[in-house]
């Protein structure tokens, strides 16, 4: 599975570069949209640009090496790789999401396995580290959810698609002053920005090697990517 992810990411990178070299100037390439829930205009909407392609390739390399680092992990090897795969799926899904709800869903999918991966297969004060990490990140998720809902209703859009909301550019400045701090705070906790970084050292110290690799190399980058993709992109003022 990890090998397939790495190969797919490399192929996607070359396809993306080929499209750009051919003169394709679309903001997002390889778009796919499927309506999930019509009343709230929730869609499974994915695509890639230069930033997301780079993050996908980085994530694939770390998942690939992390898989080999965990090859002889005991006990409950199958269960470990199940949760490790779910964590990886959340990370990849987050980077390709173009819909606010889809992005938040994959964000949560990436966070939930961390508790078990550290609490069960970690070392040292693993239960304390897992609980602290989970509580702080879920607290950040609550702020993020409020911010996302505020963006959706404040924009007056009939979609949760990031590109379409950005094109409307009609979130009032007064509301941006409310929703931007909430979304920035939500992603800032995951990005371990000061003073919300105290969960990170405990998590690194207690996590298995592969999880610590994914934690430092990819998971924390979700925070910075989310700040750029949602907070700054939709509320530039």
Feature locations, PLM:
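Transmembrane helix-loop-helix hairpins at membrane boundaries of multipass inner-membrane proteins
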Residues: 1-68, 72-82, 157-170
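Hydrophobic residues within membrane-embedded alpha-helical segments of Major Facilitator Superfamily
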Residues: 4, 55, 62, 86, ...
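Alpha-helical transmembrane segments of multipass membrane proteins
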Residues: 10, 64-68, 89-93, 116-117, ...
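Juxtamembrane/interfacial segments at transmembrane-helix boundaries in multi-pass membrane proteins
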Residues: 17-43, 141-198, 202, 226-237
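Alpha-helical multi-pass transmembrane bundles of energy-transducing inner-membrane proteins
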Residues: 19-20, 79-86, 90-176, 209
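Structural signature of hydrophobic alpha-helical transmembrane segments
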Residues: 48-59, 100-113, 176-189, 237
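C-terminal ends of transmembrane helices
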Residues: 63-74, 116-125, 191-205
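Membrane-interface helix caps and helix-loop-helix hairpins in membrane proteins
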Residues: 72-74, 95-104, 234-237
């Amino acid at each position: 599975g990890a090998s397939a992810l790495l190969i797919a990411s490399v192929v996607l990178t070359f396809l993306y570069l080929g499209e750009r070299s051919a003169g394709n100037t679309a903001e997002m390439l390889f778009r796919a949209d499927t309506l999930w829930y019509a009343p709230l205009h929730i869609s499974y909407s994915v695509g890639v640009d230069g930033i997301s392609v780079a993050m996908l390739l980085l994530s694939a390399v770390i998942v690939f090496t992390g898989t080999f680092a965990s090859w002889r992990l005991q006990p409950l090897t199958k269960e470990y790789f199940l949760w490790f795969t779910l964590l990886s799926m959340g990370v990849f899904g987050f980077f390709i999401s173009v819909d606010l709800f889809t992005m938040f869903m994959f964000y949560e999918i990436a966070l939930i396995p961390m508790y078990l991966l550290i609490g069960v297969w970690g070392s040292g004060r693993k239960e304390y580290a897992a609980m602290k990490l989970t509580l702080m990140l879920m607290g950040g998720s609550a702020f993020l959810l409020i911010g996302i809902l505020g963006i959706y209703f404040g924009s007056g859009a009939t979609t949760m698609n990031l590109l379409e909301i950005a094109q409307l550019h009609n979130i009032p400045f007064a509301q941006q002053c409310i929703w931007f701090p909430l979304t920035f705070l939500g992603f800032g906790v995951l990005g371990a920005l000061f003073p919300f970084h105290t969960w990170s050292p405990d998590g690194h110290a207690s996590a298995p090697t592969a999880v610590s690799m994914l934690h430092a190399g990819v998971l924390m980058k979700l925070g910075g990517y989310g700040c750029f993709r949602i907070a700054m992109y939709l509320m530039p003022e």
